[in-house]
Amino acid sequence: MEERGRETQMPVARYGGPFIMVRLFGQDGEANIQEQRLYELLSDPRSALGLDPGPLIAENLLLVALRGTNNDPRPQRQERARELALVGILLGNGEQGEHLGTESALEASGNNYVYAYGPDWMARPSTWSAEIQQFLRLLGATYVLRVEMGRQFGFEVHRSRPSFRQFQAINHLVLFDNALRKYDSGQVAAGFQRALLVAGPETADTRPDLRKLNEWVFGGRAAGGRQLADELKIVSALRDTYSGHLVLQPTETLDTWKVLSRDTRTAHSLEHGFIHAAGTIQANCPQLFMRRQHPGLFPFVNAIASSLGWYYQTATGPGADARAAARRQQAFQTRAAAECHAKSGVPVVAGFYRTINATLKGGEGLQPTMFNGELGAIKHQALDTVRYDYGHYLIMLGPFQPWSGLTAPPCPYAESSWAQAAVQTALELFSALYPAPCISGYARPPGPSAVIEHLRSLVPKGGLLLFLSHLPDDVKDGLGEMGPARATGPGMQQFVGSYFLNPACSNVFITVRQRGEKINGRTVLQALGRACDMAGCQHYVLGSTVPLGGLNFVNDLASPVSTAEMMDDFSPFFTVEFPPIQEEGASSPVPLDVDESMDISPSYELPWLSLESCLTSILSHPTVGSKEHLVRHTDRVSGGRVAQQPGVGPLDLPLADYAFVAHSQVWTRPGGAPPLPYRTWDRMTEKLLVSAKPGGENVKVSGTVITLGEQGYKVSLDLREGTRLAMAEALLNAAFAPILDPEDVLLTLHLHLDPSRADNSAVMEAMTAASDYARGLGVKLTFGSASCPETGSSASSFMTVVASVSAPGEFSGPLITPVLQKTGSLLIAVRCGDGKIQGGSLFEQLFSDVATTPRAPEALSLKNLFRAVQQLVKSGIVLSGHDISDGGLVTCLVEMALAGQRGVTITMPVASDYLPEMFAEHPGLVFEVEERSVGEVLQTLRSMNMYPAVLGRVGEQGPDQMFEVQHGPETVLRQSLRLLLGTWSSFASEQYECLRPDRINRSMHVSDYGYNEALAVSPLTGKNLSPRRLVTEPDPRCQVAVLCAPGTRGHESLLAAFTNAGCLCRRVFFREVRDNTFLDKYVGLAIGGVHGARDSALAGRATVALINRSPALRDAILKFLNRPDTFSVALGELGVQVLAGLGAVGSTDNPPAPGVEVNVQRSPLILAPNASGMFESRWLNISIPATTSSVMLRGLRGCVLPCWVQGSCLGLQFTNLGMPYVLQNAHQIACHFHSNGTDAWRFAMNYPRNPTEQGNIAGLCSRDGRHLALLCDPSLCTDFWQWEHIPPAFGHPTGCSPWTLMFQAAHLWSLRHGRPSE
């Protein structure tokens, strides 16, 4: 469908030129969740909104705005048609069929009612639209102005047509209260917004409350120049390096991968470096805020893990609809953040979720608030910077995408992970291309801020000289379109202020010094430009630093100034002064003392409460209940460094107390012995590698332990005590972690306070109390961030402190988790408290009208408990353990029972008041020991003035085992684990109602997850697979190129897997390949990583199109694939699409010959979206057929093994429906999704074991077996310490897993079938 455009005069940022609007329709197969909810409402005869509609029909609606008119010359119309076809190809149109066409399944006539909707065309493009536009720009498209994906649904109406009340329901359920817009015919014919511009406020918001709080904590005028964070921090100068309040923990095993292909002989090294933990708490926080803040502390930091936490008001309201609306808002906001992080290539390893009732203190006025923590690695030399001075260049990294409704459900404007991944890659490459100090400025404001605030933070003195021709393209284009009447100094100043300086954005700003010196033949700007080009990162050299204050703009639009000329003298066309910092007068903060009505030590009358009813309420509360709707739908393991992520046990339940992130995945020999000569591989065979017995060496993995502690409601009740309790929780969460030295534990506090309630003295008192407490705990302390509620208004009394622990750790055996291990063992509890209900506890919130003051335990008792349990863990006595926190003792015990799927019998003394004892939240620990060790444990604890209690016994394993509590002779609770799991998972189920289709939520298979039974027997030997941990020098005869597409991260696991298999691995970026001989020296090609684009299928097809657009890159890859001496492997969504798109897998044909263009339309397969409609991070069984031709999987034929599977589109949909049978007969099926059994025929057909329910094929190989593409990612689990759960058949192994053989087999094959040479 086409509409003729017309010339119009539109406001700034609107496209008013001639254009054609094309509508394409795609049969979606089923309505989305919102459309289903609406249809159920309208079809309910009991509802006042009932319409008696006919069957619901829904489809995708693609709108494409193309430059020009139908009267343009034929060549222009042909090029426009080509670009429109390119859009269709990127979205799945192929030669065998079109997913998008001009014919709609709906017809708005007669009694048919049709409703079209989607993102607002009069607002900035959605994130999905901006990303596809970025792909089109890289592919050279010039006629496509904007693309948006909307929806269209309809039905036949048998009664009257929809009225105002029905339209209200549509607006609420489908349009998310006008977050999306209804599309009327011809609505955008008069113009639309093409640019990403968003008008900021008339003046930048300087956030005086936030600035004041930061000055109190980190120094400034409001604090009288005192830096409390530095005065009160507790660190060891012998073990730490610090910059101000920032504490760096050293490491000697930091993986460093060479980024230049010209590096020879070695591509990997273990270097000295530092680990830094950062974080912040922000209301309505941008999803990836910390990913930009961290470079503001250390510009070359490499994020290796992150953590997320949320605070929400409890979903309450006058009716069910209001509560459902609140739950939906929370579900979509948390999902948007989780998926942004899932696409960033940095795993999320820890988190929390807390709701506070609006009737409670701290709950009133609470805005959605997010904590985002990040663990970063920094190479030693990357800490060096230069002194700030005049004459330095100002650089802006990343596409200019001002914020607009980032957190408004359904979050179409959420941040782009692609943009942030490109910036991080560019900085990493820049540090390698120019390994000398050159960055002079990188500071950022403490919270989300306007561009002008970023520039103010960057400039400690003087000002900036900025050039209009070097501003972002959208801003520059808007200036160029200004008429003569407005193109004056004041007019341009107003435009630049509105559309560049005052909006908030996602860019990273730095200043760099450039002198005459060159490194590797490049100046600083040349190296930075090359790094950005290789990373696919947009960058702008905006101007230079000057002595003249403010922002001085030069109008060089008519004759652009080059970067070399920026240091010359120029007269400003207009100047913008930095906004003045508002000086706040003396205020009278609301006192933080406990209200007079608070009872300090209440006595509860609880005869009307039963343990069962209380436990049901506690377990189903969002603060305690399962967070599987978050944990299983964000990236948990990318990069391969994660040894402990949130999921534990056979059911992958999110119950881990701590995370463990390894610093290196590359193997070393015990005792620091040098690696064996690479010629060792000449004597190896697959049989030797498979049948070899493990060497028995004690393999040690070093890394960082991460935990979180927060007590938001208790902090609101009492700032000092709540802060101490958060510190206690963070410390006890680390009690069972493999920490090297308790004295190396670093506690970092992140403050979220309202200056109108907590003045300078109150903040100082709380920080001083925290410092004293840390000193008593015997741990180090620093302050990471200080933030305040968004408005700084007294209407919101919410305050919180999040404590994070980071500590060097090392392990060589199984990690201690809450998973109960052994039938007949005993459970021991040790607590620091009096057994009464803790003030601010969840029990008190739910069952008492009295808010009592919380009390933290004495530091000495907590220190003794932590160190005693650490000693027991190191001695090997502890089998499992869990901390006592939200929900109290009984919740801790239930969670341990669920994690291990084992029955538990608890015995409470007759004399005790068991109900307060069960729900008291006094900090403590519960751990499992064998009966023979109980005496030793009790003696050890009592010798340190602790009073442990033996609570009960662990029973048999199974979902129908019982959790039982006995009070003397009376059984006060007896429930099956299956029932308790349902109660504990009920909150996640509520959230899933908003996130997943009804057919999935109601499926009988939706809970069929976990209990993976593995069968790993090699047909080569008939023995269980125990691959040898063979550590050799990199073999120059087997060089493997890891191809890194623009916008991707997380390649480290592939690099490590091949390096551990003795190969010489290097990263290769698209822009490095300049001739078709580039890959001639390589025998292996690996494709993987995580692409930051929201649409995984689009990213894969666009990547193939980008390869085809570069003849040198395309021919080099095709030449490589056609060589008989090479192998390739593609892992994950992106890798499978690229290898299939290049013709290497998915059909019985050979790849095209070099010089032949790759036809993206001819791809034999496309990726099918997950049945849940969500990103999935699952630990699933994968079976390898006994007849597969794959050379890499030869040693694993006939095995069933669990593996990590992550992505949004985890199914294969063939364009030729008969192709799966053809491939099966040709032995080109590499693997299948498998059930929880070991029988070869028991393939998984249903979600979640089969994420898409589209067939069961999970991997393919070429006809000769040289090329392999897998949706799962074995590089993430080559070592047993990377596994989510080890099936009992493997015992307690500590070495490499059977998946290692896959990479070793590639090395052996290349030596025997290739043409290796040194």
UniProtKB/Swiss-Prot annotation:
GO terms for molecular function: phosphoribosylformylglycinamidine synthase activity. SMART domains: GATase_5. It is found in: Virion tegument; Host nucleus. GO terms for biological process: intracellular transport of virus; purine nucleotide biosynthetic process. One of its GO terms (cellular component) is host cell nucleus. Coiled coil: none annotated. Keywords: Host nucleus, Host-virus interaction, Late protein, Virion, Virion tegument. Belongs to the herpesviridae MTP family. Interacts with host DAXX; this interaction disrupts the chromatin remodeling complex ATRX:DAXX and thus allows viral transcription. Interacts with host SMC6; this interaction targets SMC5-SMC6 complex for proteasomal degradation. Tegument protein that plays a role in the inhibition of host intrinsic defenses to promote viral early gene activation. Interacts with host DAXX and thereby disrupts the complex between DAXX and ATRX. Suppresses the DAXX-ATRX dependent deposition of histone H3.3 on viral chromatin allowing viral transcription. Targets also host SMC5/6 for proteasomal degradation in a CUL7 and calpain-dependent manner to support nuclear membrane-less replication compartment formation and lytic virus replication. NCBIfam families: tegu_FGAM_synt. This is Major tegument protein. It comes from Epstein-Barr virus (strain GD1). The lineage of its organism: Viruses, Duplodnaviria, Heunggongvirae, Peploviricota, Herviviricetes.
